[in-house]
Amino acid sequence: MNSRERILGRVRRALVDVPRDDPSYEQAVSRDYACEHGDRSVEQTVELLAENLADYRAIVHRTDAEGLAGLIAGLLEKRGSASVLVPSGLDEGWLSQTGVTRVTDRAESTPHELDRVDSVVTACSVAIAETGTIVLDGSPDQGRRRITLVPDHHVCVVRVPEQVVSSVPQGLERLDPARPLTWISGPSATSDIELDRVEGVHGPRTLEVILVGDA
């Protein structure tokens, strides 16, 4: 008997007294909770996202599609970045105005190699206003999870308003639970028992979010 068979055997034994006609999990759990708190316009929802991102100490920028490449170039220059990690499906135009060395995301890249990269630029899957959360799902323009956890500086682009939702339930409706989801609420931060905050222990110390709207 292998490990898989042992685990499944324990599950079967635990369920032996459950009636066959017992309702499924989806039916048994009530999901009539509110999908969002309050009634906001699209503009107010975007503003709430910006406020909560800033409250988590993320740095928020706003631009339109035409100004995006210039803004990213300026952020990398201000940061002093000599290299930037690039997901395979990132829009090439986003980095068209910077001469920073581009490092391609490779499966064989080691944590030490990723740690030597100064910045990473990604898109996102959805942004949640009520919690100030950015969610990545590992799509080609976002890359694998570790490329946004190892470099110290993360620039994340959010298209507004189409990628912005009010609440977590609304965000979950857009996400595939089978994808490798990374939920980001501000730069990495942790506190010890005395509430001394330390940033950068579990991810980037600096998170810059660019809200890209219509011109």
Could you tell me what each predicted segment is?
Residues M1-A215:
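The feature marks the mature, well-folded catalytic cores of soluble enzymes
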